[in-house]
């Protein structure tokens, strides 16, 4: 594989999984050139460079590109899968929703016989080492917001991420009552504990602030992720959660998993 066009799909953290794993491929494939099509849409309402500093393109092997019709994932109800048909004249192979747990060298070997590869996915292409995640750096204004929130946290802070709204799988396993039990257990274990709470449900956020007076730090504002401002807030929440001592998170949530992986912190999934 000499040239890879990667179309990261889904929300912020799904896209980061795909993107950073592609970065891992570059570390092991020195002739590989990666073109990333980061489309701004209802799943992710901001460009990568509006959220993070670019530590990819200085390598000379990464290019972020605007989306073209030919780059669109093949979805019958949207485009009758026509882009995939036309891509077959341009690319050696196409993979939709590709995912592997291979090491980077194994993934490169899998695609070795194809010169031009197209992948659209919200999953990792290969294993991503912790140091690649640690290289992810929010833009300066967001770092300032992250630091300000971290300064408000106590020495014993547990992160809490509650995913509600459109994630039915998460709601079916990680109920508000399950989070409350985990938080009360944390207080019983350490009466000095406080919490950083990130959630997409403002009513639930207010409920927990009342349940645990003086213990809950959170980012003020509308928790929607449908705007650029909302995506900026998501990055802030993600990095603040990653700086807590441990995380109580939601089942089937890439945001929960990414926060824990980013910080290298223990993760407990609220269940029940």
What does each of the following model-derived ranges do?
Residues 1-9, 33-35, 116-126, 155-164, ...:
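Short hydrophobic beta-strand segments
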Residues 8-17, 167-173:
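A short, glycine/small-residue-rich beta-strand->loop->alpha-helix junction that serves as a flexible
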Residues 10-11, 16, 20, 234-272:
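A donor-sugar binding/catalytic signature common to diverse glycosyltransferases
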Residues 11, 38-43, 124, 163-167, ...:
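Short, solvent-exposed loop/turn segments at secondary-structure junctions
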Residues 15-29, 179-187:
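Histidine-anchored nucleotide/phosphate-binding helix
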Residues 45-189:
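Secretory-pathway luminal glycosyltransferase catalytic domains
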Residues 49-54, 212-219, 265-267:
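Active-site regions of enzymes building and remodeling cell-envelope glycoconjugates
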Residues 161-165, 184-228:
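Catalytic donor nucleotide-activated moiety binding site of glycosyltransferases and closely related
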């Amino acid at each position: 594989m000499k040239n890879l066009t990667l179309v990261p799909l889904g929300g912020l953290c799904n896209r980061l999984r795909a993107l950073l794993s592609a970065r891992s491929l570059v570390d092991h494939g020195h002739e590989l050139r990666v073109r990333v099509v980061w489309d701004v849409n209802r799943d992710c309402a901001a460009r990568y460079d509006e959220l993070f500093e670019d530590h990819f393109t200085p390598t000379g092997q990464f290019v972020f590109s605007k989306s073209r019709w030919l780059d669109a994932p093949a979805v019958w109800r949207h485009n009758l899968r026509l882009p995939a048909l036309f891509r077959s004249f341009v690319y050696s192979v196409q993979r939709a929703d590709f995912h592997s747990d291979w090491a980077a060298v194994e993934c490169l070997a899998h695609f070795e016989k194809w010169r031009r590869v197209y992948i659209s996915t919200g999953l990792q292409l290969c294993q991503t080492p912790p140091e690649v995640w640690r290289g992810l750096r929010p833009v300066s204004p967001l770092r300032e917001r992250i630091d300000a929130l971290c300064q408000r946290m106590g020495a014993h802070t547990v992160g809490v991420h509650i995913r509600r709204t459109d994630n039915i799988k998460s709601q079916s396993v990680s109920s508000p009552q399950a989070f409350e039990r985990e938080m009360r257990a944390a207080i019983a274990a350490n009466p000095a504990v406080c919490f950083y709470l990130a959630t997409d449900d403002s009513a639930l956020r207010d409920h927990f602030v009342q349940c645990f007076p003086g213990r809950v730090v959170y980012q003020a504002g509308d928790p929607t992720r449908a705007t650029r401002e909302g995506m900026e807030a998501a990055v802030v929440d993600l990095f603040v959660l990653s700086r807590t001592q441990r995380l109580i998170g939601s089942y089937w949530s890439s945001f929960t998993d990414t926060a824990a992986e980013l910080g290298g912190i223990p993760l407990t999934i609220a269940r029940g």
